[in-house]
Amino acid sequence: MNRKYVPQEIEEKWQRYWEEKNTFKVTEDPSKKKYYLLEMFPYPSGKIHIGHVRNYTIGDVVARYKRMEGYNVLHPMGWDSFGMPAENAAIERGIHPSLWTNENITHMRKQLKRMGFSYDWDREVSTCEPVYYRWEQLFFLWMYEKGLAYKKTSSVNWCPRCQTVLANEQVEAGLCWRCGSEVVEKILDQWFFRITAYIDELLAGCDRLTGWPERVLTMQRNWIGKSYGCEVSFPMADGNGDIKVFTTRQDTLFGATFMLIAAEHPLVMELIKGKPVEKDARTFAEEVKKQDKLMRTSDYYEKQGLFLDCYCLNPLTGWEMPIFATNFVLADYGTGCVMAVPTHDQRDFEFAEKFGLRKVVVISPPDKTLDPETMTEAYVEEGILVNSGPFNGMENLKALDAIADHLIALGRGKRTIQYRLRDWGISRQRYWGAPIPMIMCPKCGTVPVPEAELPVVLPRDVDFSGEGGSPLAKHPEFLNTTCPSCGGPAKRESDTMDTFVESSWYFERYCCPHFAEKPGLNRQQVDYWMPVDQYIGGIEHAILHLLYARFYTRMLRDFGLVGVDEPFTNLLTQGMVCKETTRCPDHGYLYPEEVREGRCIHCLAEVIVGKTEKMSKSLKNVVDPDYLVRQYGADTARMFCLFAAPPEKDLEWSDQGVEGSFRFIGRTWRIVVDYLDDLQGIAPFAGDGELEGELKSLRRKTHQTIRKVRDDMGERFHFNTAISAIMELVNTLYGLPRPPREDRTALAVIRETIEAIILLLAPIVPHLTEELWQMLGHQGTCLADTPLPVYDPTVAAEDEMTIVIQVNGKVRSRVIVAADEAEDKIKALAMGDEKVSRFLEGKSVIKQVYVPKKLVNIVVKG
């Protein structure tokens, strides 16, 4: 038996075994409790990265652990395989998106299998396949029938050269991210999902998601953005209509001194028509449209504005309020108009300072008087109303309702609720997405594709020039069709669906991936597996993907296809993987393999070690998982990803840490190999007979470790502390003098410890442990199906305990006592302790406070 651990000799062997034996293939079993573990599936970009490895390792450990606990575990994997990168590859390299995608899937599947992940590959789905998106198209038709899918004109970012709509994140400094052309705003007919039909249910559901990080729930609540307030009408000074504003701060209305309107708001064009300012206003609006919408609302972004040469009236004070177009108000939030109260809103304050506008204090702090002329920032705390007419002296929060009632009585306002969330625009002028199953007929209008004609499949022979709009819009065989209603000539919808649609229900399809009957989901199978018990993925998906998935599940529920409201019971958002950067003065950033002994391999210059940042290709601070597996094995990569940091924290990459994990695995291998001959024919110690000394301590340590690991891994996902406890146990075993072969009791205790180590490590380093388990004589059994060890509380209990002795709360001594020592005896020992006695001299003992199994505090005075 090779005493040296060589992962290459065992890892592929066990991967073949699991595949040949269908070890991780599962079916519904009503007699067993189910556990559905899911990591967010990847886009098939070509190669997995260390972020994938960490994410999937976390999930795999939980899946294997739950399996060993006796659960019927569903742990599937698939591919979020529609998307722009495949289409860009077709444009840039002349390779069809389907071929590019499937080649990438083949390679990445091989990489994932090489990591030893316990996926049920029989349930693999790829969202770009018609067998998947045909059901998505069916759901679309049902949504259209129920009014949940609809088409309307909408303002979009448009690239004139690419002839396509761009998402906000695809606009960089007003330019198309791909071709660099100037992006313009365009009004187009777009398809939408009516997510707002479920808006209150989605918001209320956040309160029941107790297994989700509060940070994610806060982000979802804020994105939904439910606000209670008033819609206030500000009459135009010239008598021509009103400007309507939604505000949650009607308590500050007496301090509203000017009006702000989003520069791109249609109202701006109405207000400036025929005025000298018209040309400047149009130019300003075009400039603002090019600015990033998220940046525009940032506190730190430059606040720009243009006076529109018109005024409205404050409905409570009658003041004339100058009206400005600005960049820090968005047209699609609220009414797109904001009443500015510069003394009580910091952005308004900065704007007023910049343009020399009037400031009036209407909320005063209780301890001082504010002078608007000397204020250096807005006062945004609570206080008492001043300069507010009949409401002077009221607490501002109590004045909210009173002023709302006053506005209603004047006919100038009404109570209302506003939401930030808008309906989900799903139209994409792209080829590589699921076709929208609708037909446009000049006689009948918009007509659904008959269900019997689904799926509407993407044609293969398309033009991927990247110019002239969607390839589908230029494909006559696809575009031209017959109207299902009148039989006349018609055209297909050439837009495809947003790829977030595919990822909004893939977890339900995993429950029945081969179900080929309408409606594509087998209710019995879905009801057995759903909801997902543990979902794992990055915080970057906290809003859109998770919100869309929650909406889509409710929609499928209302169609009778699923029986749950929420798709994911528990959510873990793992941290990023970070690594220090290295840079050469001449060659810029370097990959790790381009650095040898601190020097650039290209020019031998000494490299500059930079700060630790998230791994990225641009910084070249990435680690190739394939290299890691070749060099150290998959088990080492898995262990390091789990040991280096708790799963929710960022992981700082350390080559020394990887080496350390490899060494520990090697130590574990060697100690088992070294004991193999001695343990032949020896059963694990069963508790018969009394143990003493080191054997008793070893067995106690073993059961304490089992208890800690099961607590850390099963309840809290504290894999790093669980691994640390196992390492301590291995070290304890190494420190034990080797017993003679005839000491069968000692060997039985050692075998119990070794088997516990192997079983506890099994979810973490499955290849190593399967091999060691077999070497110990468990041929014909698979460790993945072996129950976890159970600790005996009496064995794990300490014989002795250390009690801290305090005098007036300060530690003065410690005493070791029997674990079952009586309280009065412990107090007596504390009073008689030599180190304590000098702190008691000349003082009166008031009382003794005993904290069981921890400390005695002697309270004295004098």
Curated annotation (Swiss-Prot):
Keyword Protein biosynthesis attached: yes
Keywords, alphabetical: Aminoacyl-tRNA synthetase, ATP-binding, Cytoplasm, Ligase, Nucleotide-binding, Protein biosynthesis
Motif 'HIGH' region, residue numbers: 42-52
EC number(s) given by UniProt: 6.1.1.4
Source species, domain of life: Bacteria
Binding site for ATP: 617
Example of a GO cellular component annotation carried by this entry: cytosol
CDD domains, sorted: Anticodon_Ia_Leu_BEm, LeuRS_core
Segments forming a coiled coil: none
Residue ranges of the motif 'KMSKS' region: 614-618
UniProt keyword Cytoplasm, yes or no: yes
Gene Ontology BP terms: leucyl-tRNA aminoacylation
InterPro entries: aa-tRNA-synth_I_CS (IPR001412), aa-tRNA-synth_Ia (IPR002300), Leu-tRNA-ligase (IPR002302), Leu_tRNA-synth_edit (IPR025709), M/V/L/I-tRNA-synth_anticd-bd (IPR013155), Methionyl/Leucyl_tRNA_Synth (IPR015413), Rossmann-like_a/b/a_fold (IPR014729), tRNAsynth_Ia_anticodon-bd (IPR009080)
Pfam families assigned to the protein according to its UniProt record, in alphabetical order: Anticodon_1 (PF08264), tRNA-synt_1 (PF00133), tRNA-synt_1_2 (PF13603), tRNA-synt_1g (PF09334)
Gene3D superfamilies reported for this sequence: HUPs, Isoleucyl-tRNA Synthetase, Domain 1
Similarity comment text for this entry: Belongs to the class-I aminoacyl-tRNA synthetase family.
Name of the featured protein: Leucine--tRNA ligase
Organism: Syntrophus aciditrophicus (strain SB)
Gene coding for it: leuS
